[in-house]
Amino acid sequence: GTIPCGESCVYIPCLTSALGCSCKNKVCYRN
């Protein structure tokens, strides 16, 4: 929840979700 994954999720889901990232405020975060 605090580390940006360098990916946005405005139009598509986080592809980095496989790495433990989740969408928050239109940006993918990890932890």
Swiss-Prot record:
Q: List the disulfide bonds.
A: C5-C21, C9-C23, C14-C28
User: What keywords were assigned to this record?
Assistant: Disulfide bond, Plant defense
- Xref: Pfam families: Cyclotide (PF03784)
Give the record's GO biological process terms.
defense response
Q: What is known about its processing and modification?
A: This is a cyclic peptide.
Q: Does the keyword Disulfide bond apply?
A: yes
Find the cross-link Cyclopeptide (Gly-Asn): G1-N31
Protein function = Probably participates in a plant defense mechanism.
UniProt free text on domains: The presence of a 'disulfide through disulfide knot' structurally defines this protein as a knottin.
Q: Which family does it belong to?
A: Belongs to the cyclotide family. Bracelet subfamily.
Protein name, please?
Answer: Cyclotide mden-N
